[in-house]
Amino acid sequence: MISRIPRLLFENILVPVADVLTKSVSNFAGHKSDQSYNSNATRVSTISDEEIEFYLNLKSAVLLLCLALCIAGFSVLMYFLYVLVFVPYNRVKRLGSIGYQNHEEGHLSKKDIANLVRRRRKVGDDLPPVFPNGWFRLVDSQQLEPGQVKQVTALGEHFAVFRSKSGKASILDAYCPHMGGNLAVGGIVKNDCLECPFHGWRFDGDGKCVAIPYSEKIPTFAKTKSWPCREVNKAIFVWFHCDGKEPEWEIPDISEISTGKFTYKGRVEHHANTHIQDVPENGSDLAHLSHLHVPHAMSGANLSTQYSSWWNFAEHIFKAQCIGPADGEPHISLFYLTHYLHVFKRFKLLSLNLNVYQIGPGIVHLHFDSPFGKGVFVQTLTPVEPLHLVLTHNLHASWSIPVWLGRIFLYLEAIQVDRDVMIWNNKTFEPRPKLLKEDSLIAKYRRWYSQFYTENSPRLTLKSEDGNGW
């Protein structure tokens, strides 16, 4: 039966279409294939042999064109199916793409509005330090191939992140100590070292200069700063401490990822115009879950219209329980979250149980158990500069959650984060919020989070000549 399908398509679709197109083109060109009448109304054929040959050749050409278009369309369809089924999801929301739909300066571009909001936003003197101490993601593992170097700007620093030929990742200061050349722009990885594009000085992963092409002797001062680096859970992290202290704790390895039990399904990246503490503080703000995130994800991320969507027959219901700091690991905070979809206020569908681990100021592991299988969202937060951060969610899940289903998970999760970003992009950080007793977890969370600030942690200062700056 299946073998007959191409023949049936050819005979019942392509050939009739070719006939119609051929007649149309032939008539348009002045080659009439029908019969004409003489003065006595007697039908006389006027088709010559040349016209018959022209007609047949034209029909063959049109038939081949239709066949080529069908093959091209089928190829495009198969490509999109391949991407949907096998290619991990990758969605990036740049700064300015979310949360500025209803701004008073609606005639401006989103990029201009985003910059305008950043300049005009009320920033008080009590804003917490902008760069806490801890581990922060710079790139995902799959984004850095062996022998490749990338420039990453984060935490007020410029990093050269490179992977040696043997596969080891290292992080150096981007600027060469010799004459300030940028090691990550034009630099070349040679074996386990990074060569400066300016004069050819070569540095190993520890920052030591191991070769200078025009000097036989390498002076002891020929070295650059090497940053503590860890590659864990398919991402590369840097340790930042304002006082230059060595790492005080390590990032937990998720065994299901390292052993391959969970496979990579995709990622979502958001750029947000906010203070880094605003983002993880969401976990302790239970009241916002039952308001901001209740409308179904398909009702969209625009907060002014989501409640008017016809998708409101279904609602997201969240219940959370905060556990607090982990025993013996004060840098980790735990809480449990349950979710289900409430349809027509009667049926509970798609239940989801999450164990959430806040690890330092910039990492969150969200382990979930769903009707489709188990998995983990690895959330990372990295400040690019004061009040501008990158938020990523990488999904790793069991074989029972295929890539196409992972795409749906990530898409729905991204819409919920879009709603948060719309709030973050337009809010100010309130250092002394007016909290109710029902908001007590927020105060507890802020006390816990304060451990990642020290006396010398960088703060945002105000410059009258150009607005916000250092």
Swiss-Prot record:
PROSITE patterns listed in its UniProt record: RIESKE
Q: What is this protein called?
A: Cholesterol 7-desaturase nvd 1
What's the Enzyme Commission number for this chain? 1.14.19.21
Q: Which Gene Ontology terms describe the biological processes this protein takes part in? A: cholesterol metabolic process
- Annotated Rieske domain ranges read 136-238
Q: Which GO terms describe its molecular function?
A: 2 iron, 2 sulfur cluster binding; cholesterol 7-desaturase (NAD(P)H) activity; metal ion binding; oxidoreductase activity
Note whether Iron occurs among the keywords.
yes
Q: Which terms in the GO cellular component ontology are assigned?
A: cytoplasm; membrane
Chief place of localization? membrane
The pathway that the record names for this protein is: Steroid hormone biosynthesis; dafachronic acid biosynthesis
> Gene for this protein?
nvd-Ci-1
The membrane topology term of the UniProt record is: Single-pass membrane protein
Q: Name one Pfam family in it.
A: Rieske
Source domain of life is: Eukaryota
Reaction(s) this enzyme catalyzes, per UniProt: cholesterol + NADPH + O2 + H(+) = 7-dehydrocholesterol + NADP(+) + 2 H2O; cholesterol + NADH + O2 + H(+) = 7-dehydrocholesterol + NAD(+) + 2 H2O
Which species is listed as the source? Ciona intestinalis
